[in-house]
C-alpha cells in the first residue's frame, strides 16, 4: 500500500469517527462496533470458484481447530503461493494475502474479520470474542 493510500485510509477513518487524528490512535470502541456490526455490510465478500490460495475466515489459524468443516468448506484468498485449495474469497484489499503471509497477528485478525463477513452464527460469535480480545490486548 502506498503512503498516499495509507493517508487516504486514515483520513476516511477519521471522517467515519474510527480514528482520532489528534491522538493518532484508533477509537477502539467505535472500531469494535464497526467490525462486529458493519463490516459484513460495507465489505460483502465475492465468492468464486475453487482455486489455490491462503485459508481465511473460519478455516484460518484462529478458528480452524474450533469447527469441523468439509474440504468443500475451505475459503481461500486466491494467491499463487497459497498452500491450500478452496473456494475463492475476496480479501478486503488486493495486497492482503501477500502481507498476511509476512505477519501472523495481522493474518489472524483478518481471518476473524472474514469470518464476520461470511460465517454462521456460532463462528461469528467466537470470531467476535477473539477479535474483541485482540483489540483490547493491542489497544
Model-derived segments and spans:
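Hydrophobic/aromatic-lined pockets within catalytic cores
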Residues: 14, 18, 117
Amino acid at each position: 500500500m502506498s503512503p498516499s493510500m495509507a493517508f487516504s485510509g486514515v483520513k476516511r477513518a477519521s471522517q467515519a469517527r474510527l480514528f482520532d487524528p489528534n491522538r493518532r490512535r484508533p477509537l477502539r470502541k467505535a472500531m469494535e462496533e464497526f467490525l462486529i456490526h458493519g463490516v459484513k455490510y460495507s465489505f460483502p465478500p465475492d465468492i468464486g470458484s475453487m482455486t489455490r490460495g491462503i485459508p481465511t475466515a473460519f478455516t484460518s489459524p484462529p478458528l480452524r481447530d474450533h469447527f469441523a468443516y468439509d474440504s468443500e468448506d475451505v475459503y481461500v484468498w486466491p494467491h499463487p503461493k497459497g498452500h491450500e485449495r478452496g473456494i475463492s474469497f475476496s480479501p478486503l484489499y488486493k495486497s492482503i494475502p501477500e502481507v498476511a503471509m509476512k505477519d501472523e497477528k495481522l493474518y489472524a485478525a483478518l481471518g476473524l474479520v472474514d469470518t464476520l463477513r461470511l460465517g454462521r452464527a456460532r463462528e461469528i460469535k467466537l470470531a467476535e470474542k477473539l477479535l474483541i480480545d485482540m483489540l483490547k490486548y493491542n489497544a
